[in-house]
Design a protein with these regions (language model features):
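DNA-recognition helix of helix-turn-helix
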Residues: 20, 29, 35, 41-65
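Hydrophobic patch in the ABC ATPase nucleotide-binding domain
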Residues: 5, 16, 32-34
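Short, leucine-enriched amphipathic alpha-helices that occur as contiguous helical runs
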Residues: 6, 20-21
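Short alpha-helical "packing" element that flanks the helix-turn-helix/winged-helix DNA-binding module
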Residues: 9, 23-24
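Acidic, proline/glycine-rich intrinsically disordered inter-domain spacer in sigma factors
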Residues: 1-14
């Protein structure tokens, strides 16, 4: 990623709630499986999965919005 892409990604991550951001980073950066994240955060697996997918959707909307400018 170049500097601009990293800035856009940080912006998209900052728009997420704390728990959503944590789940995305644990999965995408730390490489943890959703089941491991659920155990770590003491959340049901279904909750982790829904928060993860909701967070990705939010990030996609933000990033596509930045591309449209």
């Amino acid at each position: 990623l170049d500097a601009v892409e990293r800035t856009l990604l940080r912006h998209a991550l900052a728009a997420l709630g704390e728990e959503e951001r944590q789940i995305v980073l644990l999965h995408a950066v730390a490489g943890m499986k959703h089941r491991e994240i659920a155990a770590l955060l003491e959340l049901p697996l279904a909750t982790v999965l829904s928060k993860y997918h909701r967070a990705l959707k939010k990030m996609r909307i933000i990033l596509e919005g930045d591309d449209a400018r």
